[in-house]
């Protein structure tokens, strides 16, 4: 959690993986990780999840309720998996904004979508989830897939997402979570802390970034805690769905 102090005048700290760092340094450290992995992000996602990330994202799209003419914000949109699908759903009368705080990831996403002809109804914005640069009551749907765990002040980000949603608009948070049984949890720990860094070393020559990613998953709030955080931020009808025995959870909330 944030706001851990060693003294009354000390800067608040937050976790970066299993380490505590000053809050002012976390965004820069996370940026370094994603600058490092951006070029091979899609390849590593496929390898590390066995392609399952595509099924998880498909389920999120199905629950989004997005239709023609909608305005959608895809936060931490990265290489554009969700944006590509939403672009087809909203059609020429709708709009999708792919927002990412990381310039390298945003460039990869822009280039990838332009290469497959997705451009007319898509806008690319470098933006901080905690301080979204959009008007109040602007979007029909906001999504953040595998990005919330990297945000320093998650409560601020959730409130910012609520602000930019229209009344009745939906927030979907797709994120790694806590396995629902002990056997899966032990197997997942072994996989995350041994296999993931090894693959990072072999494919990207960067084991440390993938060690951070494994640690960041463990530090992320569990399913019930994130549900409570969304309720506290002001969302109604908050529910979540566990996938792959809780390795991933999809949370959904509605703006009143």
UniProtKB/Swiss-Prot annotation:
EC class name: transferase
Residues binding S-adenosyl-L-methionine: 79, 100, 128-129
Catalyzed reactions per annotation: a 2-demethylmenaquinol + S-adenosyl-L-methionine = a menaquinol + S-adenosyl-L-homocysteine + H(+); a 2-methoxy-6-(all-trans-polyprenyl)benzene-1,4-diol + S-adenosyl-L-methionine = a 5-methoxy-2-methyl-3-(all-trans-polyprenyl)benzene-1,4-diol + S-adenosyl-L-homocysteine + H(+)
Stretches of the chain forming a coiled coil according to its record: none
CDD domains: AdoMet_MTases (cd02440)
Classification via Gene3D superfamilies: Vaccinia Virus protein VP39 (3.40.50.150)
Protein keywords: Menaquinone biosynthesis, Methyltransferase, S-adenosyl-L-methionine, Transferase, Ubiquinone biosynthesis
Pathway field: Quinol/quinone metabolism; menaquinone biosynthesis; menaquinol from 1,4-dihydroxy-2-naphthoate: step 2/2; Cofactor biosynthesis; ubiquinone biosynthesis
Enzyme Commission number: 2.1.1.163, 2.1.1.201
Highest taxon of source: Bacteria
UniProt-listed Pfam families: Ubie_methyltran
GO biological process, alphabetically ordered: aerobic respiration; menaquinone biosynthetic process; methylation
InterPro entries listed in its UniProt record: SAM-dependent_MTases_sf, UbiE/COQ5_MeTrFase, UbiE/COQ5_MeTrFase_CS
Molecular function in Gene Ontology: 2-methoxy-6-polyprenyl-1,4-benzoquinol methyltransferase activity; demethylmenaquinone methyltransferase activity
Disulfide bridge positions per record: none
Entry function: Methyltransferase required for the conversion of demethylmenaquinol (DMKH2) to menaquinol (MKH2) and the conversion of 2-polyprenyl-6-methoxy-1,4-benzoquinol (DDMQH2) to 2-polyprenyl-3-methyl-6-methoxy-1,4-benzoquinol (DMQH2).
Family: Belongs to the class I-like SAM-binding methyltransferase superfamily. MenG/UbiE family.
HAMAP family reported in the protein's UniProt record: MenG_UbiE_methyltr (MF_01813)
Name of the molecule in the record: Ubiquinone/menaquinone biosynthesis C-methyltransferase UbiE
Lineage of the organism: Bacteria, Pseudomonadati, Pseudomonadota, Gammaproteobacteria, Pseudomonadales
Gene: ubiE
């Amino acid at each position: 959690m944030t706001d851990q102090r060693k003294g009354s005048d000390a800067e608040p700290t937050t976790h970066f993986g299993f380490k505590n760092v000053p809050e002012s340094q976390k965004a820069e450290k996370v940026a370094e990780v994603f600058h490092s992995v951006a070029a091979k992000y899609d390849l590593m996602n496929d390898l590390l999840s066995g392609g399952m990330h595509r099924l998880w994202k498909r389920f999120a799209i199905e629950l989004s309720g997005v239709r023609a003419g909608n305005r959608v914000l895809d936060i931490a949109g990265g290489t554009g998996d969700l944006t590509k699908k939403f672009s087809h759903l909203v059609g020429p009368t709708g709009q999708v904004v792919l927002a990412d705080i990381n310039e390298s990831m945003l460039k990869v996403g822009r280039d990838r979508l332009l290469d497959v002809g997705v451009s007319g109804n898509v806008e690319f914005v470098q933006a901080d989830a905690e301080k979204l640069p959009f008007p109040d009551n602007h979007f029909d749907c906001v999504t953040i897939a595998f990005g919330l765990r990297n945000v320093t002040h998650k409560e601020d980000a959730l409130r910012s997402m609520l602000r930019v949603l229209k009344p009745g608009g939906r927030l979907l948070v797709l994120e790694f979570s806590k396995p629902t049984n002990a056997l899966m949890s032990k197997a997942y720990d072994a996989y995350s802390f041994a296999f993931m860094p090894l693959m990072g070393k072999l494919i990207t020559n960067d084991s440390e970034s993938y060690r951070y990613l494994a640690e960041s998953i463990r530090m992320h709030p569990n399913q019930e805690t994130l549900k409570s955080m969304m309720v506290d931020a002001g969302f109604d009808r908050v529910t979540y769905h566990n996938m792959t025995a809780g390795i991933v959870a999809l949370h959904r909330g509605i703006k009143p």
